Amino acid sequence: MIPLSDGIPSRRFPVVNIALIAANFAVFLFFELPNGEAAVNQASFYPCDVDNACHSALPWGVAWITAMFMHAGWDHILGNMLFLAIFGNNVEDAFGRLGYLVFDFAGGFAAMMLQTGITLLFGTAADAQIPNLGASGAIAAVLGAYIVLYPKSRIRTLLVWFPISIPAWVYLGGWFLYQFFEGKYALLHPSNERGSGVAFFAHVGGFIFGAIVARILLAAGRITPTETQRAAYR
């Protein structure tokens, strides 16, 4: 289901969220498209680098950052940026600009590390040489924080061709379960091409990280939705 809006107004202009979206498009338009596969080889993250530096275009400690701004095609970047545009602004409101920026990168790192661990433990040597790229792990962390902060927010989405409105906990909870079970299926059926090329456990890891961090900070009173935002989903 494609999300259309969440109905919660931003407290202030989401500077960091817009900057992240702009940076992703800039990298895609001015680095990836002109350079093609060479760009992917140069700036993606390879799980095998953590183990034995099998690719080494960049040190893996740098590549996990550059990989967050790389995408496999127009559908990949448009889908990711749509989710970030809809859900990221309200999470930025709660975390603050600097906190949101740190959270985004930390979520991306957590997502990449879980996917890498799963690949190295259960995958083949060939799997470990497949480039990991995309902002979806960091965005999954944003979704995990959102479901904790705004569980009853109404998400307008397309069901086939019909717009419907459902609670965020249903929409994002369903999204998470889909990622988890598709990832589990991929582990149990490695020769099957269903979901091939999708780093499902990066999505799972990012989402869990985001939800845990948001829950801890919310309980500690370090972050909170504004009164206007609370009123939007009562």
Region spans (language model):
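A detector for small-residue-rich transmembrane helices and their helix-helix packing motifs
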Residues: 1-234
